[in-house]
Amino acid sequence: MATRHQAREAVIGLLYAYDLGNPEIKKFAEDILEEKKIRNKQREFALALFKGTVEHLDTIDEMIKKHLESWDMERVGHIERAILRLGVYELFYTDLDPAIVINEAVELAKKLGTDQSPKFINGVLDAIAKEVKNGSQKA
């Protein structure tokens, strides 16, 4: 049985494909999750994360852009962008503890990104989480 971490990793793959210009990925998301053996509750969890992130993508991207110091969104790698998008979605649209969201994102960055990815992901998501905690940003 797949874990939530594995479900999130599969969602990163879906978001990555979507970001590369494959909007058809939405139609095949369930099949792709089945291929990766993401089933039952974890499949529902993964689909909710993917669909929610895509649905709120414009708002999520604005939040990310606001916290990119000296960076353009286009300079952020596709994997890192997918991880940030999922992390921001979970920070704003789920009841998960921000520390868990950030830790999961950093672990995904360690596995899927470059050597610099974990620190970058941690910094951006931490800044966004602090803003959420202070109530100065509403989704």
UniProtKB/Swiss-Prot annotation:
Keyword RNA-binding among record annotations: yes
One of the entry's Gene Ontology molecular-function terms is: RNA binding
Which Gene Ontology cellular-component terms appear in the entry?
Answer: cytosol
Q: Name the keywords, alphabetized.
A: RNA-binding, Transcription, Transcription antitermination, Transcription regulation
In terms of SUPFAM superfamilies, this protein maps to: NusB-like
What start and end residues bound the annotated signal peptide?
none
Query: Record's PANTHER family?
Result: ANTITERMINATION NUSB DOMAIN-CONTAINING PROTEIN, N UTILIZATION SUBSTANCE PROTEIN B-RELATED
What's this protein's function?
Answer: Involved in transcription antitermination. Required for transcription of ribosomal RNA (rRNA) genes. Binds specifically to the boxA antiterminator sequence of the ribosomal RNA (rrn) operons.
> How is this protein named in the record?
Transcription antitermination protein NusB
Task: Provide the species name.
Answer: Nitratiruptor sp. (strain SB155-2)
What are the leading ranks of the lineage?
Bacteria, Pseudomonadati, Campylobacterota, Epsilonproteobacteria, Nautiliales
